[in-house]
């Protein structure tokens, strides 16, 4: 080949590659433009939704030949990710189907595949939105009503399955019921008898299902003034009301009605037979919940009426608002703006609906979807964006919550305390306290004075003591927290009579002179292990006085701030470990922290958290200490349970971490073995990335990881057994004593304690569930008092 020819060939190759890149780039630009047009259709613009749809159909129809798969994918994604625009996209698909029947069939197949995949992967919300979309396609003459009813019937068949959890059956019934508002009218007009048959099957199931879980999930134990309805019961009542109204609802926008003359001419597709995947033990289904109600129409001022509790509009509005929070919760400003831009805000008292839904999220049982502070920050942004109305609605809601606090669930009480204190801190701690002063006449354990006391404790964490004292009326003096200062007994007037005073003073001098841990040990070694009457828990296995002198002196010297305390603990970590060899010694350390910092709850929380992180004290020691006689006076205070829950969470995180590491190691080992086997069989010796020894864990390493996980599981089980056993002991003792004395056992103390037991079950339900059979065998036996046993049975019913 001549040099010239070679040069020409190179030029042609370069031009070919450049043209190919240009085509790819142009195609990408068109795809991006199509995606943008589809995503934004139906949103606010100068033209109507209908004209937007007509324009978009023309664009998509022209591009179907080239970008068919891309369009299918975008539309099916929109169906799942933008359920609030369901009817806009079903209308779009209907218009495309009217023009291109083949594309309509391909889309239905694609949507069915998405639905089946969502069920298989346990993506329950995605499955429900896919089902809703398929149902709404009946309204657009894309899918036949008969084939949809067959699918709905198949889903209701799941309610008759044996030996599967009730939560599985519940979800399939819920998915069908929540779809009916979209398609009920069309099915009623075309297939009334088949629809009635479907509803009858649902009613039979709802009448026989167990609702043992109901009481565990209620925000309030009382049904006055608003019933605390179980979610399926409430939705069923709303569907029955919709049926009485001949399936006519007033909330869902239906743009396809404008195009009825076009859509009714289109050929319809039949859904294929869809069989729900069978139950597997590793499937996790959504847990049941109770529908939260705070307002009714009498609470709202003149203006649009709040839809009734059993109107389908209430369900649709609430579901839409919940979805907005789910979509935008990462950015509070956007979330607040989207909530206030609710499309149908002129038809409803929007501020009341938003506040009710935000509190429904905050008080959701067993746990809220997001952190408490997420909801608090959203409410603050709402108040900033709508200062004329929203603060008043929020104040009204707070008043309602406070007046109903007597029957409030203990977990929700804690969340209410956390939210209100945080909210006050963002609004200069301003509140009309005088309106609540009637609570001062009540017993200190009553929920109302207890609420104010706990709120002030939390406000103290967000401010300072003098500020709290100044903001409160003088009548509230008994509820104001004590000044948070250390009570260092070796500096008190009576210190001369204490056995460890001399060594304590030596230790102060040494630590201030920046002594080493070894020097501290040397100072402490002369303290005798006897003659210390102040520590009854010492059984001779550890030196209680040595712990007393060291812990109180060191932490008093570090009392200036959290950082000073942490630095002191870290520097003398080895001394702590040497002193805390047994669980009794660890409990003694906790006792001394409490003795020193009893007036500073937050300091106790952070110090114990630090000791757990540094493995100075074990989780089981903290649990035992919390239930000790010494802490009886603190037992109903919120901070003590904050300590217990952070202790349990720390143990849970440790187990989860070890579990994850073991799974990853096993996976790497399996891949390495598989890769080694494949390379031996590969005659061409074409290897992928080689598996190095560093990547592949040895079988011995995996075995050690298994042993560590097994030990962690044993410790976790022991922790739960300690906690639940102590609960059973103190509650049984209270009930027996009340019965013997002829007193009503239903005291404030009893309600707090039974509430805390329930809280441990619900807050840590995923971990406790693993040991439910052990708990049933060892602790929650049939001979236990029914009041205590019922809490366990309600917990088990959540996943039953």
UniProtKB/Swiss-Prot annotation:
GO molecular function, one term: mRNA binding
SMART domains (UniProt xref): MIF4G
Compartment list: Nucleus
TM region positions: none
Keyword Transmembrane helix: no
Cysteines engaged in disulfide bonds, as pairs: none
Assembly: Component of the nuclear cap-binding complex (CBC), a heterodimer composed of Cbp80 and Cbp20 that interacts with m7GpppG-capped RNA.
Family: Belongs to the NCBP1 family.
Function per UniProt: Component of the cap-binding complex (CBC), which binds cotranscriptionally to the 5'-cap of pre-mRNAs and is involved in various processes such as pre-mRNA splicing and RNA-mediated gene silencing (RNAi). The CBC complex is involved in miRNA-mediated RNA interference via its interaction with Ars2 and is required for primary microRNAs (miRNAs) processing. Also involved in innate immunity via the short interfering RNAs (siRNAs) processing machinery by restricting the viral RNA production.
UniProt protein name: Nuclear cap-binding protein subunit 1
Organism: Drosophila melanogaster
């Amino acid at each position: 080949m001549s040099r010239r020819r070679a040069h020409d060939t190179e030029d042609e190759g370069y031009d070919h590659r450049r043209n190919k890149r240009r085509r790819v780039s142009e195609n990408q630009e068109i795809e991006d433009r199509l995606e943008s047009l589809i995503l934004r259709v139906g949103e606010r613009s100068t033209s109507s939704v209908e004209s937007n749809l007509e324009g978009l159909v023309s664009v998509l129809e022209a591009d179907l030949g080239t970008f068919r798969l891309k369009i299918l994918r975008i539309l099916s994604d929109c169906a799942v990710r933008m359920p609030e625009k369901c009817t806009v996209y079903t209308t779009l698909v209907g218009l495309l189907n009217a023009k291109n029947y083949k594309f309509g069939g391909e889309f239905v197949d694609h949507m069915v595949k998405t639905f089946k995949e969502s069920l298989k992967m346990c993506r329950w919300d995605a499955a429900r939105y896919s089902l809703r979309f398929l149902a709404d396609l009946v309204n657009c003459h894309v899918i036949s009503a008969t084939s949809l009813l067959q699918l709905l019937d198949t889903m209701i068949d799941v309610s008759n399955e044996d030996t599967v959890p009730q939560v599985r059956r519940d979800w399939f019934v819920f998915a069908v019921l929540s779809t009916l508002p979209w398609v009920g009218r069309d099915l009623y007009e075309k297939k009334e008898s088949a629809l009635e048959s479907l509803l009858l099957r649902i009613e039979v199931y709802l009448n026989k299902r167990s609702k043992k879980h109901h009481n565990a999930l209620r925000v309030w134990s009382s049904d006055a003034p608003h019933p605390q309805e179980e979610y399926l019961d409430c939705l069923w009542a709303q569907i029955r009301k919709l049926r009485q109204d001949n399936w006519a609802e007033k909330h869902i926008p239906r743009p396809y009605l404008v195009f009825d003359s076009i859509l009714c001419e289109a050929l319809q597709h039949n859904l294929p037979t869809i069989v729900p995947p069978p139950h597997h033990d590793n499937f996790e289904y959504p847990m049941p919940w109770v529908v939260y109600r705070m307002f009714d129409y009498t609470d709202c001022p003149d203006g649009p009426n709040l839809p009734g509790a059993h109107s389908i509009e209430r369900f649709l509005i609430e579901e839409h608002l919940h979805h907005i929070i789910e979509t935008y919760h990462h950015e509070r400003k956007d979330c607040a703006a989207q909530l206030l831009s609710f499309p149908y805000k002129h038809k409803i008292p929007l501020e009341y609906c938003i506040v009710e839904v935000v509190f429904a999220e905050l008080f959701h049982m067993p746990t809220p979807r997001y952190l408490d502070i997420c909801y608090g920050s959203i409410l603050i942004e709402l108040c900033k964006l709508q200062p004329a109305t929203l603060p008043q609605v929020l104040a009204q809601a707070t008043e309602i919550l406070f007046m109903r606090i007597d029957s409030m669930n203990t977990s929700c009480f804690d969340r209410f305390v956390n939210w209100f204190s945080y909210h006050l801190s963002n609004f200069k701690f301003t509140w009309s306290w005088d309106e609540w002063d009637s609570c001062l006449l009540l017993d200190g354990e009553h929920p109302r004075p207890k609420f104010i006391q706990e709120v002030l404790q939390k406000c103290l964490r967000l401010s300072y003591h003098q500020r709290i004292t100044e903001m409160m009326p003088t009548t509230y003096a008994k509820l104001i927290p004590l000044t948070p200062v250390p009570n260092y007994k070796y500096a008190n007037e009576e210190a001369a009579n204490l056995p460890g005073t001399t060594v304590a003073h030596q230790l102060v001098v040494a630590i201030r002179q920046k002594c080493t841990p070894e020097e501290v040990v040397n100072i402490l070694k002369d303290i005798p292990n006897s003659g210390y009457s102040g520590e009854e828990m010492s059984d001779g296995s550890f030196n209680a006085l040595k712990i007393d002198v060291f812990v109180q002196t060191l932490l008093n010297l570090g009392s200036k701030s959290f950082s000073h305390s942490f630095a002191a603990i870290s520097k003398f970590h080895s001394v702590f470990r040497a002193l805390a060899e047994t669980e009794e010694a660890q409990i003694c350390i906790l006792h001394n922290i409490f003795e020193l910092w009893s007036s500073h709850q937050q300091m106790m929380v952070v110090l114990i958290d630090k000791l757990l992180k540094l493995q100075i004290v074990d989780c089981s020691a903290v649990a035992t200490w919390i239930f000790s006689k010494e802490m009886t006076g603190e037992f109903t205070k919120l901070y003590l349970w904050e300590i217990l829950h952070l202790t349990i969470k720390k143990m849970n995180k440790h187990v989860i971490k070890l579990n994850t590491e073991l799974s990853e190691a096993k996976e790497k080992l399996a891949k390495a073995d598989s890769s080694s086997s494949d390379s031996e069989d590969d005659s061409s010796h074409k290897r992928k990335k080689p598996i190095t020894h560093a990547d592949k864990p040895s079988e011995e390493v995996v075995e050690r990881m298994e042993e560590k996980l097994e030990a962690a599981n044993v410790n976790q089980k022991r922790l739960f057994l300690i906690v639940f056993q102590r609960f059973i002991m103190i509650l049984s003792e209270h009930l027996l004593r009340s019965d013997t004395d002829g007193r009503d056992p239903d005291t404030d103390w009893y309600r707090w304690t039974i509430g805390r037991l329930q809280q441990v079950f619900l807050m840590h339900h995923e971990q406790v569930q693993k040991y439910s059979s052990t708990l049933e065998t060892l602790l929650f036996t049939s001979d236990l008092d029914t009041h205590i046993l019922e809490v366990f049975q309600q917990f088990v019913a959540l996943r039953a």
